Protein backbone atom coordinates (compact mmCIF):
# COMPACT_ATOMS: atom_id res chain seq x y z
CA UNK A 1 0.00 0.00 0.00
CA UNK A 2 1.39 3.40 -0.97
CA UNK A 3 0.59 6.43 1.11
CA UNK A 4 0.55 10.02 -0.11
CA UNK A 5 3.05 12.41 1.49
CA UNK A 6 1.74 14.52 4.34
CA UNK A 7 0.82 18.11 3.55
CA UNK A 8 3.86 20.37 3.44
CA UNK A 9 6.37 17.51 3.24
CA UNK A 10 8.45 16.77 0.21
CA UNK A 11 8.63 13.26 -1.20
CA UNK A 12 12.16 12.01 -1.80
CA UNK A 13 13.04 11.50 -5.47
CA UNK A 14 13.21 7.76 -6.10
CA UNK A 15 13.37 4.89 -3.63
CA UNK A 16 14.90 4.81 -0.15
CA UNK A 17 16.73 2.26 1.98
CA UNK A 18 16.97 2.84 5.73
CA UNK A 19 19.91 0.94 7.28
CA UNK A 20 19.69 0.26 11.03
CA UNK A 21 22.85 -1.23 12.62
CA UNK A 22 21.93 -3.04 15.83
CA UNK A 23 23.88 -4.80 18.56
CA UNK A 24 21.94 -6.08 21.59
CA UNK A 25 19.02 -3.72 20.92
CA UNK A 26 16.06 -6.06 21.53
CA UNK A 27 14.48 -3.44 23.81
CA UNK A 28 14.73 -0.74 21.13
CA UNK A 29 14.58 -2.27 17.68
CA UNK A 30 10.83 -2.95 17.45
CA UNK A 31 9.68 0.61 18.27
CA UNK A 32 12.37 2.00 15.94
CA UNK A 33 11.25 -0.17 13.01
CA UNK A 34 7.55 0.47 13.65
CA UNK A 35 8.20 4.20 13.78
CA UNK A 36 10.06 3.97 10.46
CA UNK A 37 7.18 2.04 8.87
CA UNK A 38 4.89 4.85 9.97
CA UNK A 39 7.10 7.75 8.82
CA UNK A 40 8.89 6.63 5.65
CA UNK A 41 5.77 6.43 3.42
CA UNK A 42 5.47 10.21 3.78
CA UNK A 43 8.79 10.64 2.00
CA UNK A 44 9.25 7.69 -0.36
CA UNK A 45 6.61 5.61 -2.09
CA UNK A 46 9.12 2.76 -2.38
CA UNK A 47 11.30 2.04 0.63
CA UNK A 48 12.87 -0.77 2.59
CA UNK A 49 14.30 -1.11 6.08
CA UNK A 50 17.49 -3.17 6.40
CA UNK A 51 18.38 -4.12 9.98
CA UNK A 52 21.92 -5.42 10.45
CA UNK A 53 22.17 -7.56 13.57
CA UNK A 54 25.86 -7.37 14.47
CA UNK A 55 26.25 -10.58 16.44
CA UNK A 56 23.74 -9.71 19.15
CA UNK A 57 23.51 -12.06 22.11
CA UNK A 58 19.98 -11.01 23.02
CA UNK A 59 16.73 -11.35 21.08
CA UNK A 60 17.39 -8.63 18.50
CA UNK A 61 17.41 -11.02 15.53
CA UNK A 62 14.23 -12.79 16.63
CA UNK A 63 12.38 -9.48 16.99
CA UNK A 64 13.44 -8.38 13.49
CA UNK A 65 12.56 -11.75 11.97
CA UNK A 66 9.02 -11.38 13.33
CA UNK A 67 8.77 -7.85 11.93
CA UNK A 68 10.07 -9.02 8.54
CA UNK A 69 7.55 -11.86 8.45
CA UNK A 70 4.75 -9.35 9.02
CA UNK A 71 6.00 -6.73 6.53
CA UNK A 72 8.06 -7.50 3.44
CA UNK A 73 9.64 -4.04 3.50
CA UNK A 74 11.71 -5.11 6.52
CA UNK A 75 14.83 -7.22 5.92
CA UNK A 76 17.36 -8.74 8.30
CA UNK A 77 21.10 -9.08 7.66
CA UNK A 78 22.94 -11.09 10.31
CA UNK A 79 26.56 -11.25 11.41
CA UNK A 80 27.25 -14.54 13.22
CA UNK A 81 29.66 -12.69 15.51
CA UNK A 82 30.13 -9.08 16.51
CA UNK A 83 32.24 -7.42 13.82
CA UNK A 84 31.85 -3.77 14.77
CA UNK A 85 29.75 -0.73 13.94
CA UNK A 86 31.54 0.01 10.68
CA UNK A 87 31.22 -3.56 9.47
CA UNK A 88 27.49 -3.48 10.25
CA UNK A 89 26.99 -0.32 8.22
CA UNK A 90 29.07 -1.68 5.34
CA UNK A 91 26.91 -4.83 5.22
CA UNK A 92 23.78 -2.70 5.28
CA UNK A 93 24.99 -0.49 2.45
CA UNK A 94 25.89 -3.55 0.36
CA UNK A 95 22.42 -5.02 0.91
CA UNK A 96 20.63 -1.77 0.07
CA UNK A 97 18.65 -1.25 -3.14
CA UNK A 98 17.38 2.30 -2.81
CA UNK A 99 18.22 5.29 -4.98
CA UNK A 100 18.99 6.93 -1.66
CA UNK A 101 20.43 5.24 1.42
CA UNK A 102 19.86 6.56 4.91
CA UNK A 103 21.31 5.23 8.11
CA UNK A 104 20.31 5.80 11.71
CA UNK A 105 21.24 4.16 14.98
CA UNK A 106 18.68 1.76 16.44
CA UNK A 107 18.92 2.99 20.04
CA UNK A 108 16.02 5.49 19.90
CA UNK A 109 18.33 8.48 20.35
CA UNK A 110 17.17 9.74 16.94
CA UNK A 111 13.66 10.05 15.54
CA UNK A 112 13.29 8.97 11.91
CA UNK A 113 10.68 11.72 11.56
CA UNK A 114 13.58 14.19 11.37
CA UNK A 115 14.07 12.93 7.82
CA UNK A 116 11.64 15.74 6.98
CA UNK A 117 14.47 18.17 7.80
CA UNK A 118 16.91 16.49 5.40
CA UNK A 119 14.48 15.61 2.59
CA UNK A 120 14.39 19.06 0.90
CA UNK A 121 18.14 18.85 0.20
CA UNK A 122 18.46 15.24 -0.98
CA UNK A 123 17.77 15.89 -4.66
CA UNK A 124 20.56 18.46 -4.94
CA UNK A 125 23.32 16.89 -2.81
CA UNK A 126 25.23 13.60 -2.78
CA UNK A 127 25.25 13.54 1.03
CA UNK A 128 22.90 15.20 3.51
CA UNK A 129 24.42 14.88 6.98
CA UNK A 130 22.65 15.55 10.23
CA UNK A 131 24.32 17.20 13.20
CA UNK A 132 22.99 17.01 16.73
CA UNK A 133 21.49 20.33 17.80
CA UNK A 134 21.95 19.34 21.44
CA UNK A 135 23.81 16.14 22.21
CA UNK A 136 22.23 14.08 25.01
CA UNK A 137 25.28 12.04 25.99
CA UNK A 138 27.54 11.94 29.07
CA UNK A 139 30.15 14.71 29.37
CA UNK A 140 33.14 12.47 28.59
CA UNK A 141 31.56 11.37 25.30
CA UNK A 142 30.87 14.97 24.29
CA UNK A 143 34.43 16.06 25.12
CA UNK A 144 35.95 13.19 23.17
CA UNK A 145 33.63 13.92 20.24
CA UNK A 146 34.80 17.55 20.04
CA UNK A 147 38.45 16.49 20.13
CA UNK A 148 37.78 13.88 17.47
CA UNK A 149 35.94 16.36 15.21
CA UNK A 150 38.96 18.68 15.30
CA UNK A 151 41.32 15.77 14.57
CA UNK A 152 39.28 14.75 11.53
CA UNK A 153 39.30 18.31 10.18
CA UNK A 154 43.07 18.57 10.57
CA UNK A 155 44.04 15.13 9.20
CA UNK A 156 41.46 14.62 6.46
CA UNK A 157 40.15 18.05 5.52
CA UNK A 158 36.61 16.95 6.41
CA UNK A 159 34.67 19.86 7.86
CA UNK A 160 31.56 18.40 9.46
CA UNK A 161 30.08 19.87 12.60
CA UNK A 162 29.31 16.40 13.94
CA UNK A 163 31.21 13.71 12.04
CA UNK A 164 29.74 10.79 13.99
CA UNK A 165 26.10 11.87 13.94
CA UNK A 166 24.24 8.69 12.98
CA UNK A 167 21.62 10.37 10.81
CA UNK A 168 22.68 10.76 7.19
CA UNK A 169 21.30 10.26 3.66
CA UNK A 170 23.56 9.29 0.73
CA UNK A 171 23.11 8.93 -2.99
CA UNK A 172 22.73 5.17 -3.28
CA UNK A 173 25.22 4.53 -6.06
CA UNK A 174 27.83 6.65 -4.27
CA UNK A 175 27.76 4.76 -0.98
CA UNK A 176 27.47 1.32 -2.61
CA UNK A 177 30.50 1.93 -4.84
CA UNK A 178 32.70 3.21 -2.04
CA UNK A 179 35.28 0.66 -0.75
CA UNK A 180 34.95 0.79 3.04
CA UNK A 181 37.31 -0.95 5.45
CA UNK A 182 36.90 0.62 8.90
CA UNK A 183 35.28 -2.02 11.14
CA UNK A 184 34.47 0.34 13.99
CA UNK A 185 33.25 3.85 14.70
CA UNK A 186 35.72 5.43 12.24
CA UNK A 187 33.43 4.38 9.38
CA UNK A 188 31.89 7.88 9.31
CA UNK A 189 35.30 9.48 8.89
CA UNK A 190 36.27 7.03 6.15
CA UNK A 191 33.06 7.74 4.23
CA UNK A 192 33.50 11.50 4.43
CA UNK A 193 37.23 11.43 3.66
CA UNK A 194 36.62 9.37 0.51
CA UNK A 195 33.57 11.43 -0.43
CA UNK A 196 35.74 14.55 -0.18
CA UNK A 197 38.31 12.99 -2.53
CA UNK A 198 35.48 12.23 -4.97
CA UNK A 199 34.22 15.80 -4.83
CA UNK A 200 30.81 14.75 -3.48
CA UNK A 201 28.45 17.59 -2.59
CA UNK A 202 27.43 17.91 1.05
CA UNK A 203 24.69 19.63 3.05
CA UNK A 204 24.53 19.70 6.86
CA UNK A 205 21.22 19.93 8.73
CA UNK A 206 20.49 20.08 12.45
CA UNK A 207 18.53 17.15 13.95
CA UNK A 208 17.26 16.28 17.41
CA UNK A 209 19.03 13.90 19.77
CA UNK A 210 17.38 12.17 22.72
CA UNK A 211 18.61 10.37 25.85
CA UNK A 212 18.91 6.60 25.60
CA UNK A 213 15.88 4.98 27.25
CA UNK A 214 16.89 1.30 27.04
CA UNK A 215 19.94 -0.82 26.36
CA UNK A 216 23.57 -0.02 27.10
CA UNK A 217 25.75 2.45 25.20
CA UNK A 218 29.30 1.31 24.37
CA UNK A 219 30.50 4.15 22.15
CA UNK A 220 32.24 6.03 24.95
CA UNK A 221 34.15 3.12 26.49
CA UNK A 222 37.95 3.28 26.76
CA UNK A 223 38.25 0.25 24.48
CA UNK A 224 36.21 1.94 21.76
CA UNK A 225 38.15 5.20 22.10
CA UNK A 226 41.53 3.45 21.83
CA UNK A 227 40.28 1.49 18.84
CA UNK A 228 39.16 4.72 17.18
CA UNK A 229 42.63 6.23 17.70
CA UNK A 230 44.30 3.21 16.11
CA UNK A 231 41.84 3.20 13.20
CA UNK A 232 42.44 6.93 12.65
CA UNK A 233 46.14 6.34 12.04
CA UNK A 234 45.40 3.36 9.77
CA UNK A 235 42.88 5.37 7.75
CA UNK A 236 45.37 8.22 7.37
CA UNK A 237 47.85 5.72 5.94
CA UNK A 238 45.28 4.05 3.64
CA UNK A 239 44.11 7.36 2.21
CA UNK A 240 47.54 7.78 0.60
CA UNK A 241 46.69 4.84 -1.69
CA UNK A 242 43.05 5.72 -2.25
CA UNK A 243 42.19 6.76 -5.78
CA UNK A 244 38.73 8.16 -6.59
CA UNK A 245 36.85 6.04 -9.17
CA UNK A 246 36.54 7.14 -12.78
CA UNK A 247 32.89 7.98 -12.09
CA UNK A 248 33.82 10.58 -9.45
CA UNK A 249 32.25 13.92 -10.32
CA UNK A 250 35.05 16.25 -9.18
CA UNK A 251 38.10 14.24 -8.03
CA UNK A 252 40.31 16.05 -5.54
CA UNK A 253 43.98 15.49 -4.63
CA UNK A 254 45.15 14.08 -1.28
CA UNK A 255 44.90 16.43 1.70
CA UNK A 256 48.54 17.43 2.16
CA UNK A 257 47.88 19.63 5.19
CA UNK A 258 46.82 16.48 7.02
CA UNK A 259 50.17 14.89 6.22
CA UNK A 260 51.98 17.94 7.55
CA UNK A 261 49.89 17.86 10.74
CA UNK A 262 50.52 14.16 11.30
CA UNK A 263 54.27 14.50 10.74
CA UNK A 264 54.40 17.51 13.05
CA UNK A 265 52.53 15.56 15.72
CA UNK A 266 54.88 12.59 15.40
CA UNK A 267 57.86 14.94 15.57
CA UNK A 268 56.59 16.63 18.72
CA UNK A 269 55.85 13.27 20.34
CA UNK A 270 59.34 11.99 19.47
CA UNK A 271 60.93 15.15 20.86
CA UNK A 272 58.93 14.84 24.08
CA UNK A 273 59.95 11.19 24.50
CA UNK A 274 63.59 12.05 23.83
CA UNK A 275 63.47 14.80 26.46
CA UNK A 276 61.95 12.44 29.02
CA UNK A 277 64.56 9.81 28.24
CA UNK A 278 67.41 12.29 28.75
CA UNK A 279 66.02 13.41 32.10
CA UNK A 280 65.63 9.83 33.23
CA UNK A 281 69.21 8.85 32.43
CA UNK A 282 70.94 11.90 33.87
Spans of features found by a protein language model:
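Hydrophobic helical membrane-anchoring modules
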Residues: 1-14, 157, 180-282
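A conserved acidic beta->alpha catalytic loop
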Residues: 53-62, 108
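N-proximal low-complexity "stem/linker" segments adjacent to membrane-targeting elements
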Residues: 1-38, 44-45
